[in-house]
Amino acid sequence: MAKRSIFRSVAAVLAFGMCMTGLAGCGSEKRADGKTEIEVVSYKPEAVKAFEKIEKRFNETHDDIHLTISSPNEAMTILKTRFIREDYPDIIAIGGDINYSNFLDADLFDDISDLDEVQTIKQAYLDMDKELEFIPKDGTYALPYVANAAGILYNKDLFEENGWKVPTTWQEFTTLCDEIEQSGTLPLYLGFKDTWTCLAPWNALAVGLTDSDTCNQVNMGNTTFSDTYGPVAEKMRALLDYAEKNPYAYGYNDACTAFARGEAAMYPIGSYAIPQIKSVNPDMNIGSFTFPANDEESDNVLNSGIDLQFSVMKSCKNKEAAYEVLKYLYDDETIQIYLDDQGGIACKDGDFAIPETLEDMRPYIENNRMADYQDHHYPSEMSVDAMIQTFLLDTSDNAQEKFLKKFDSDWKRYNRDLIRKVQDYQKEQGDA
């Protein structure tokens, strides 16, 4: 992923280019056959077969528009390079994360709030996009498509054989871990050698123990991570008591393999790990439950984020044609084509199947008890995953205090310009 400092340079070039050229672009051009060309660039190369099928069906049913969907490797790098060259596609399909925030802040996206399909999206996912705005903006700039969910994967057969129940509170969770341990089975496998895996349980705990807009509140100067992340850090460290010895010696693949072989009853990771696990044990019966981070079940929140969403570029010359493409993409049958190929949770309200592995999460999904991954707000150059691993390796008495202080200081260091921008906006609003 490109560093934020690099992107700031990209944004500066973009701002200059837009002023000088009026958003010149290559999208929405007329083809030799008279059709309007609409180009979509997706950041998900793993979904290329689904998009090829969708593209083919669209083109077979539309006489006036030709749709091209590309899903290149390193799509984000390619997009940023194209933006510098003012070679804009009409629509981009990316995740709801810091890249979306940066592109939106660079004023690249058009307001699509007049698109009827906006009204069909689950409110929780629209709210996630609003919280990704550095500065509040009127309008809607992305249409969430498919979401994922992360909590704790568990071996359903092991649970059934031993009479173990899915926990709904932190006390029930630790009691269950003790019970599993006493049976001779390892409760958890972590695989923290690959630092990014540290973020999986961190995010799942954080959404239940902190407000979803914590990062924005820190930017506004209303709180600090030292004041808010203490319970998250405490419970993150508590997981070590129930995991493999020296989890920093084993990586993601090791953890998937160990869990697949029944070496641990649970694995705190997202549903995205299931294909890797099933490559080792295709017949494994896997479930996934919301991380029970709180003392009361009613306080728990499912960690769910937007895996894919569509934004219309401001440079798009034919918004009507772009809207026709979006309407087709958000047809129930089209969404199902994507879900059948890639899985996930439909962001659109409707009668879409929830994957069997996520069935325990259904009440949270259906009742919008969901919040976005906190790391979607973290600047990549801050390397929060490595910070968490370092904290967990630190056995000193003041390890947590040092970790949280560093989180605060590094946040200010890597978000200095953003914090100034947010607080200037707050002052302007106060003076208005």
Feature map (PLM): residue ranges:
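Extracytoplasmic "Venus flytrap"/periplasmic binding protein-like
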Residues: 57, 61-125, 157, 161-162, ...
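Extracytoplasmic/periplasmic substrate-recognition and gating elements
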Residues: 60-61, 66, 138, 162, ...
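A structural signal for short loop-to-beta-strand junctions that line the ligand-binding cleft
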Residues: 81-82, 89-90, 119-157, 186-190, ...
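Hinge/lid segment of periplasmic solute-binding proteins
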Residues: 95-150, 174, 180, 201-203, ...
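Mature extracytoplasmic/periplasmic domains
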Residues: 108-111, 261, 272-276, 308-382
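Extracytoplasmic/periplasmic solute-binding protein
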Residues: 137-145, 150, 174-221, 264
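Conserved C-terminal helix/tail region of periplasmic/extracytoplasmic solute-binding proteins
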Residues: 160, 336, 369-432
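Glycine-centered hinge/linker elements that transmit conformational signals in sensory
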Residues: 177-180, 218-248
